[in-house]
Amino acid sequence: MKTAQRILLTATRLFNEQGERNVTANDIALELDISPGNLYYHFKGKDGILSALFADYYRELASLLAAPLIDDSFLDQSNPLERGWLFLTVLLEVMYQHRFLYLNQSDLMQRYPEIDRGMRRLMALKKRSAAQLATDLLASADAIPPTATPEHIADSMAMTLMYWLSFEQFAGESLSAQQSIHRAVLQVLSHCAPYLGEKQGDFFAECELINTRLLEKSSS
């Protein structure tokens, strides 16, 4: 593995574990057992590392958010709820791998204009995907009140996506990556739960049971 890639991987791990604010370029070099000069040869300090990490993250997430959510061939799933569940799982896996961006996002957006612009664009893409997902899920709903438009529900879903990792940090619960992602998916889909049809409602109930079992396993 090339040194530049090792630097990015190590920086991501340290940022996730210790918080971006608490990690310096020298900390990253020390962890890699390389000289600070070697690190600066590849990146212009911590700012350069953050810029590269966010650029990679933005490309990956934007590509996922461009997915055709209402296409039955997407993820080979014809059931809208299963398709949405799998899509959100993949999306949240990427977000979890770069969770330091969400644990300190307001501060990062204030300090780095490129991150501010990128995060705002990603929020718009998340809202668009959430609206598609809500439209797909509510197509077979039993009854939808006039105020429960896909756009209204999408706002709540996108907000949960944007701030869930930060909420978990403040909650202080020790969850594995799988448990955290699973619960986040459940929370996002819960905004559509009151309007799901019988078949999808049964599937959602099963998802809740899976989530409960995972949490019980982690506490035992």
Where are these regions (language model features)?
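Amphipathic alpha-helical segments used for helix-helix packing
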Residues: M95-R117, L133-D136
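Amphipathic alpha-helical packing segments from all-alpha helical-bundle domains
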Residues: E114-S140, E151-S166, R183-P194
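Hydrophobic/aromatic residues within well-ordered alpha-helical segments
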Residues: L53, Y57, L61, G84-F87, ...
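Hydrophobic alpha-helical connector segments
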Residues: A52, A67-Q97
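C-terminal peripheral helix-coil segments that are non-catalytic and often amphipathic
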Residues: F170-S220
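Secondary-structure edge/capping motif, primarily at the C-terminal ends of alpha-helices
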Residues: P68-D76, Y102-M109, L137, A141, ...
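Helix-turn-helix
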Residues: R6, L14-A52
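Generic hydrophobic, amphipathic alpha-helix propensity
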Residues: T3-A11, I28, L53-Y57, L61, ...
